[in-house]
């Protein structure tokens, strides 16, 4: 597979995210969402000869890019796995509790959105796929073809936050009984007609497509598992930086960090004898949530929804 697909990706919050990791020259770091390697390359430029960086991605095109980088720089290794599985990879490499920092840059990348053949976009017609790894799992077309109307509506509503989810799901099922969906443009058109109240400046298929993508790739489940695995992998004093792009992701990150700042006692039954340390925070927050600067927004409008939260492990 060619590495240069012709679709460019501008890394969001590049300097801010790498700075948030408080890099040590000899540290071991994880880039849980390698993508096209923007963050990884900057991290490597700041590491010394003893530093190490382990990258994760599900996307075969990202893996090809990562393999090329690994061939150039022996401090870097790329792994084709979801960051939700980083715990197993870290354990296999003897790095549990020894990682100095973890970076997660969530969501879909610009090359994935802009390449019609990946099936993520309602703007460019392509096969209705949406899988980060096209070799694994059920495609969006397969899900739409077989799921009950109630399940399609749930995905649109729960993951896409689409208020007309039921109406749009019924329109999808009515159309699939006549002709199956195989192309993104066909689905987008049906969703467009079924949506009675278009949001200004937003394509009426936007929320439903987001819901489908999140469901097909189990993005929220992976995020919850990945956050826990990242915290376990970190050494005391290690940093976790997470960039999210919509409210569902950010809510999970915010609640995860808030719970650990408070300590674990809130999650235990009342009157249960516990050791004092469970009342102590497991992490501390580093600064407030960060957003793209005006300069970055101007250069890359897609950064407008990005929010980064950073935490440091205390115990």
UniProtKB/Swiss-Prot annotation:
Subcellular location: Cytoplasm
Annotated residues for binding of S-adenosyl-L-methionine: 37-39, 57, 83, 105, 112
InterPro entries: RsmH, SAM-dep_MeTrfase_MraW_recog, SAM-dependent_MTases_sf
Keyword Transferase: yes
Cysteine disulfide partners in this protein: none
Enzyme Commission numbers on file: 2.1.1.199
GO molecular function terms listed in the Swiss-Prot or TrEMBL record: rRNA (cytosine-N4-)-methyltransferase activity
Catalysed reactions listed for this entry: cytidine(1402) in 16S rRNA + S-adenosyl-L-methionine = N(4)-methylcytidine(1402) in 16S rRNA + S-adenosyl-L-homocysteine + H(+)
GO biological process, one term: rRNA base methylation
Family: Belongs to the methyltransferase superfamily. RsmH family.
HAMAP family linked to this entry: 16SrRNA_methyltr_H
Name under which the protein is recorded: Ribosomal RNA small subunit methyltransferase H
